[in-house]
Amino acid sequence: MQELYFRELGEGKPLIILHGLLGTSDNWLTLGKKYAEHFKVYILDQRNHGQSFHDDEFSYPAMAEDLLNFMNNQNIEKAHILGHSMGGKVAMTFATEHPNRVDKLIVADIGPQSYPPHHTLIFKGLFSLDLPNLSSRKEADEKLAEYIPEFGVRQFLLKNL
């Protein structure tokens, strides 16, 4: 069993934060510090993101299982769970499978429905990168710009390189 990277802040009832697709725990650090005034906050890097392990299996049930393993490893019986976007889908899956482990569920920026693919160009851009042969982030940015015109989106993606 592989373990997730996480940041731990504050004291009190546990609040677990799950980031969105292509995000990391960094995205939630500012709010996590604020929430830590009232809760013991765990900000996770989900599988295939940030400093957590990478695996071919990438599904909501697998990620919900990662969350269960994390809670068991940290001796967290029950927690408030906040999930953003993809993290919201993971949180909803987890709450459905393990309702007795969820104190409060907060789902942000996504609903319990299927969505059509809308990251196609982003993934094409990412897959076009020849990572071993890139010499700089600027070079990666120039390649991504062929697929992704928004500077801010590219900078967000480059954080994971």
Q: Which residues are covered by each model-predicted region?
A:
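Alpha/beta-hydrolase active-site loop signature
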Residues: 22, 46-50, 112
